[in-house]
C-alpha cells in the first residue's frame, strides 16, 4: 500500500469543503412538518494525517414533542419510545438544536470547512426532519447544507448490494445489535462506523485520491 505525500489529506479537501456529520432521528411519524421529533443523535468525524476517516465526538438528546405535533401510535410502537415518559429527560427542540449546531459550527471552523453536510441512513428522512425542526425554532444559524447529503443506504447498496443498515454493517464487518436498533444514539454510532468504512474502503482500493497514478509514491507510514 502507498500514500501520496503531496496530497492534502485534510477533511475539507476530501469532501469539497463540507464537514460530514452523522445523524439519526427517531420520530412519531413520517411527516417532518407535522409529526413529532422524539430523539436525535449526532456523531462528528475526523480525518488523520494519512487520510483515514474516524469517529470523533457525539451528542444525544431526547426531545419534547413540539406544540401541536402529531404522534402516530404505529410509529412509537415501532421505535418503542414513550414521548411522555418523564424518565426520558427530554429537552426542547430549540435546546437540542442549539447545542448540536454549536458543536457542528465548532468542528466546521476547526477543520476549515464551509458548511456541514448530513450523513444518514436513508438521509432524506433525517434531513427533512432536521430542516423542519430548524425552521420551527427560528433556524439558529443552521450550519447544514440545505439539500446535499451523504446517504449510507445508497452507498451501501453500491458497495455491498445491501441497503438495510444491519445487513450493510454485517458485510462491512461492523457488529450490529438488533435489540438496540432504532435508538437514535446506537443507530448513529453504527452509521458513523459504516460511513467511515465506506470512505476508507474506497481509499484502500485505490479510489482516493482520484487520478493519482502520476503522483510520487512513498511507502505507507
From Swiss-Prot:
Residues marked Important for substrate binding and specificity (site): 30, 78, 125, 147
Keywords, alphabetical: Exonuclease, Hydrolase, Magnesium, Metal-binding, Nuclease, tRNA processing
Cofactor(s) needed: Mg(2+)
Pfam family, one: RNase_T
GO cellular component, one term: cytosol
Catalytic residues (UniProt): 182 (proton donor/acceptor)
InterPro entries with a match to the protein in the record: Exonuclease_RNaseT/DNA_pol3, RNase_T, RNaseH-like_sf, RNaseH_sf
SUPFAM superfamilies reported for this sequence: Ribonuclease H-like
Residue ranges constituting the Exonuclease domain according to the UniProt record: 21-195
E.C. no: 3.1.13.-
Residues annotated to bind Mg(2+) 2: 24, 26, 182, 187
Top EC class for this record: hydrolase
Protein residues bound to Mg(2+) 1: 24
Cofactor note: Binds two Mg(2+) per subunit. The active form of the enzyme binds two Mg(2+) ions in its active site. The first Mg(2+) forms only one salt bridge with the protein.
GO MF: 3'-5' exonuclease activity; magnesium ion binding; nucleic acid binding; RNA exonuclease activity, producing 5'-phosphomonoesters
BP-aspect Gene Ontology terms: DNA replication proofreading; tRNA processing
Domain of life: Bacteria
Similarity comment: family membership: Belongs to the RNase T family.
Function recorded in the entry: Trims short 3' overhangs of a variety of RNA species, leaving a one or two nucleotide 3' overhang. Responsible for the end-turnover of tRNA: specifically removes the terminal AMP residue from uncharged tRNA (tRNA-C-C-A). Also appears to be involved in tRNA biosynthesis.
Subunit structure, interactors included: Homodimer.
UniProt-recorded name of the protein: Ribonuclease T
Species annotation: Buchnera aphidicola subsp. Cinara cedri (strain Cc)
